[in-house]
Every structure is written in C-alpha cells, then in structure tokens.
Amino acid sequence: MSFNDSNLEGQIGEEMYINYLKDKNIEFFDVREDLQCQWMDIDFIIPSNNHTKEEILKEVKHAKPNTRATRQKEIGYTVEVKLDKVTHNRFKKHNGEITEGTGNLVYELISHNMPGCLARSYADFILYVCVDNFGSETILKKAYMINLYKWRQAMVNTGKYNTQHIVLKPTKYVKENNKLVEENILNILHPVKDLLTVEGAVKDLTDTFMKYFPKNINI
C-alpha cells in the first residue's frame, strides 16, 4: 500500500485508531466526512451512555474547556488524529551520525494563512502519531494521546514557550485566482520530554497501538 499525499498520509494514523476501536469493541462515530466536524477538526467521537453525535458536538462546541474533563465519562469525548514524520525519525548527518529526530511536537498556529488545525481544533484529545521509514516500510515510532486543553495550558503557563519556540517557516508563494500570494505557516515547537512532565497532559500509548498500525505501507 502506498500513501502519496498529505491526506492519505493522515489516514495511516486514522486507520490505526479505527483498528484499535473495533478490536476493543468500543462504540465510535467516524465523522471525518462530516462538514461541521471538519470545521471543528474532529475525526472521531466516542460516546458514553447512549448520547448522540449531535449532543456531544453541541457540548464540545459550547462548554468551557476546563469543564469538559468532568463530563467526558458522562457524555463522551472527541479525538483528532495527527501524523508526524519528524519528532522521532532517525536520520543520518553528513558525518554518518544517527540522530533521533527533533524531539518536538508541532502545534500549528497558522497554516496556509489560516488558523492551524490544532489551533482551531475542538477535539478533547489529539492522537499524535509519530512515524519513520525503515527501509521501504513506514513504521510506528510513538503514539501519544494528548489532552488538548492541558497541552494548550502548558504552553500558556510555561515561560519557556516564548518567541524562540515559535517557528515561522520561510514564506512560500502559491497561486490563487491566477495570482501569486504569500502562504504563511507558524508553529510552536513543544519538547515531548517537557509535555510528559505535565500531569494528565499526555499518555504514551505506543505499546497499545503498535499491533494496530497498518502494515506494508510506505510514505
């Protein structure tokens, strides 16, 4: 199986999560094709106590983020899946040394001149899937389930995350209506090791998800 563009790349992590949910007989709504959920950047809804998709989305959209945690067991929660190819990849430097990726999670503030997917997401949790290429096959390196509210709080509350951790990629020019326009991308780089120290912010679920990762793929 070969995934050749960014949309298909993202489906790798989504397929892994679906395999897990089905194997564990966990009820879920696949809302990736739902226009409202695309706008809210939500991929999956895990309901509780027979609540409907509409009931959960209404609460997610209007409830205060700091109250959501107390309601998730009662009504359900939402998940967005993100694929990352740089956090834990292994690459050779010019001198032959092997380096273990960047060690940073990427929080997208601006992408394609719009709010980034994580900046605008209403998801309760981000399944952050880190992959690497091993020979001709793409393999799972790490899978983190991140509480998005606590991730945002960690970035706000920690003095470390100042301008030196905000990376503006070189301006690119894209064609819109036959005119070249600037395309800006703005990210916050957040070290994994720092987020792992924030209570309740992230769980390393690599061992749990390893057997559900799609086989024989190359991106």
Residue ranges and their predicted role:
Residues 40-42, 122:
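Short beta-strand or tight-loop elements
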Residues 45, 127-129, 144:
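Conserved hydrophobic/aromatic positions in well-ordered beta-strands
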Residues 65-72, 113, 131-219:
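Non-catalytic C-terminal interaction segments of nucleic acid-processing enzymes
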Residues 71-74, 85-119:
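Mg2+/Mn2+-dependent nuclease catalytic core
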